């Protein structure tokens, strides 16, 4: 099971939000590329990037920072990127620039046909980001709540060729309150698509809890504020995940 450090980009800086609120942003670095190199040096095997401005604008915004990060980490640490990806041209450009996986969120919810088209055009490179509050999916930078049940919606994407579903519990994101293991496990059990947990991964207990259910289809856990504020030591977390859930799904 991979522990995946997150870099959220706002106005070119590395920030963390509380529950997706843009006006509750803490700046952790004004040099995101240097931060990415730091996580690579700590042994990270993948990096999670979010263009926060892009998520709200519905189009890419932090291109320069994204390009600098991809160049800084090279091919050895694959980058998965979400935020504002709404068309095939954007996906193609990001992949050409060295991003390994693109994450489609709002567009997948509003236009499943686009998701299917993207998976067909770029097999093995498309993930879905499903962000939920109390089990209901939110869109547009978490600013709008839909009536979609997260499990029901995810099951519709079976057979599309989605590489993974990134499941975020909005109520826990950036709050250091612990990951929602039960909801993540329920989603993983319902799907044949691998699941990556996000939101609230705070300490080694969360890593232990997710590792215990990794066999149900959880291949990774994204962590942000915890590794920046020190409640979770990244290297320790990955070592523990390797010991408890190493080799699950070959990651």
From Swiss-Prot:
Where are the coiled-coil regions? none
The UniProt family comment states: Belongs to the HisA/HisF family.
Enzyme Commission number: 5.3.1.16
Q: What does the record give under GO molecular function?
A: 1-(5-phosphoribosyl)-5-[(5-phosphoribosylamino)methylideneamino]imidazole-4-carboxamide isomerase activity
From the UniProt record, list the reaction(s) this protein catalyses.
Answer: 1-(5-phospho-beta-D-ribosyl)-5-[(5-phospho-beta-D-ribosylamino)methylideneamino]imidazole-4-carboxamide = 5-[(5-phospho-1-deoxy-D-ribulos-1-ylimino)methylamino]-1-(5-phospho-beta-D-ribosyl)imidazole-4-carboxamide
Q: Identify the catalytic residues.
A: 8 (proton acceptor), 131 (proton donor)
| Top EC category | isomerase
Query: Pathway, per Swiss-Prot/TrEMBL?
Result: Amino-acid biosynthesis; L-histidine biosynthesis; L-histidine from 5-phospho-alpha-D-ribose 1-diphosphate: step 4/9
Q: Which GO terms describe its biological process?
A: L-histidine biosynthetic process; L-tryptophan biosynthetic process
Record protein name field = 1-(5-phosphoribosyl)-5-[(5-phosphoribosylamino)methylideneamino] imidazole-4-carboxamide isomerase
CDD domains assigned:
HisA (cd04732)
Keywords, A to Z, come to: Amino-acid biosynthesis, Cytoplasm, Histidine biosynthesis, Isomerase
Location in the cell reads: Cytoplasm
Gene Ontology terms: cellular component: cytoplasm
Q: What is the lineage of its organism?
A: Bacteria, Pseudomonadati, Pseudomonadota, Betaproteobacteria, Nitrosomonadales
Keyword Cell inner membrane included in the entry's annotation: no
């Amino acid at each position: 099971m991979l522990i995946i450090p997150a870099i959220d980009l706002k106005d070119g800086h590395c920030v963390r939000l509380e529950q997706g609120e843009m006006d509750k942003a803490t700046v952790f670095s004004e040099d995101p590329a240097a931060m990415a190199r730091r996580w690579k040096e700590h042994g990270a095997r993948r990096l999670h990037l979010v263009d926060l401005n892009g998520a709200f604008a519905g189009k890419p915004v932090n291109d320069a920072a994204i390009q600098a990060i991809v160049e800084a980490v090279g091919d050895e640490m694959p980058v998965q990127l979400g935020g504002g990806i709404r068309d095939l041209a954007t996906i193609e450009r990001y992949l050409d620039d060295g991003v390994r996986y693109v994450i489609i969120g709002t567009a997948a919810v509003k236009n499943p046909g686009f998701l299917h088209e993207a998976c067909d055009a770029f097999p093995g490179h498309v993930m879905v980001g499903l962000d939920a509050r109390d089990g209901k999916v939110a869109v547009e930078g978490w600013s709008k709540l839909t009536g979609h049940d997260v499990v029901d919606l995810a099951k519709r994407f079976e057979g599309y060729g989605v590489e993974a579903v990134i499941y975020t519990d909005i109520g826990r994101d950036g709050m250091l309150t612990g990951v929602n293991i039960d909801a993540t496990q329920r989603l993983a059990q319902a799907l044949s698509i691998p699941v990556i947990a996000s939101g609230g991964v705070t300490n080694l207990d969360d890593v232990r809890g997710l590792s215990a259910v990794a066999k149900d289809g959880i291949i990774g856990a994204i962590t942000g504020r915890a590794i920046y504020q020190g409640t979770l030591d990244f290297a320790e977390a990955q070592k523990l995940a390797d010991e408890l859930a190493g080799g699950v799904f070959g990651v």
